[in-house]
């Protein structure tokens, strides 16, 4: 007989494992790319698709019924075509970019505009600390797929470094 060494959270006490398996498995083939997941994704140069698996990530779309419920972190897969990326931003939690396929140019930036960039390939990552301006651009010849994790179950939407983007950072949520 197996012994669970840690207690289940209250909402899973007594729930059959068949139901747990159904609720906590996410399959890429069942995910629809969300090309409007972020406010900056409306702008040429920042177009990308989010595939949400665990929670909403930095999109703010916390009511998505197709995702695995998030408690302490989120996990998404991003698809970015050549010449696209995202706007410089910060988060109130750590954010990780982990490249699965293709190449991604990631950057960190200070408040004076000084920017350092490095290229990540498959199975390489960057962990972006809280409050550090960061972002990415696909400057390669092919598309990139990468995993994004945020260190909170319901993080805030992106804290864009650009004042105008920041003022309207939640506008994409009202359009839904």
Where would I find each of the regions flagged by the language model?
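A short, N-terminal "cap"/entry segment at the start of jelly-roll beta-barrel domains
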Residues: 1-71, 164-176
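Conserved short histidine dyad/triad with adjacent acidic residue
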Residues: 56-63, 76-91, 130
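Short, solvent-exposed loop/turn segments that connect beta-strands within catalytic domains
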Residues: 66, 111-115, 142
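A short hydrophobic beta-strand segment most commonly corresponding to one strand
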Residues: 96-98, 127, 141-160
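Short acidic-glycine-tyrosine-enriched beta hairpin
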Residues: 110-130
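Short beta-strand His + acidic residue motifs that chelate non-heme Fe in jelly-roll/DSBH
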Residues: 86-89, 106-107, 128, 134-140, ...
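Short, conserved beta-strand element in jelly-roll/cupin
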Residues: 72, 77-82, 90-110, 149-152
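A structural connector/turn signal
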Residues: 75, 85, 94, 115, ...
């Amino acid at each position: 007989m197996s012994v669970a060494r840690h207690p289940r959270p209250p909402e899973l006490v007594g729930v059959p494992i068949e139901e747990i398996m159904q609720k906590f498995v996410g399959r890429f083939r069942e995910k629809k790319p969300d090309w409007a997941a972020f406010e900056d994704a409306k702008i040429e140069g920042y177009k990308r698709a989010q595939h949400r698996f665990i929670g909403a990530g930095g999109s703010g779309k916390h009511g998505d019924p197709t995702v695995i419920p998030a408690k302490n972190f989120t996990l998404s897969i991003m698809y970015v075509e050549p010449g696209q990326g995202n706007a410089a931003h910060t988060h109130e939690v750590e954010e990780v970019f982990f490249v699965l396929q293709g190449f991604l140019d990631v950057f960190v930036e200070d408040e004076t505009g000084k920017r350092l960039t490095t290229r990540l390939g498959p199975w390489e990552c960057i962990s972006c600390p809280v409050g550090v301006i960061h972002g990415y651009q696909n400057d390669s010849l092919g598309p990139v797929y990468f995993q994004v994790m945020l260190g909170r179950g319901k993080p805030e939407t992106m804290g864009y470094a650009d004042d105008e983007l920041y003022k309207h950072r939640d506008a994409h949520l009202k359009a839904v």
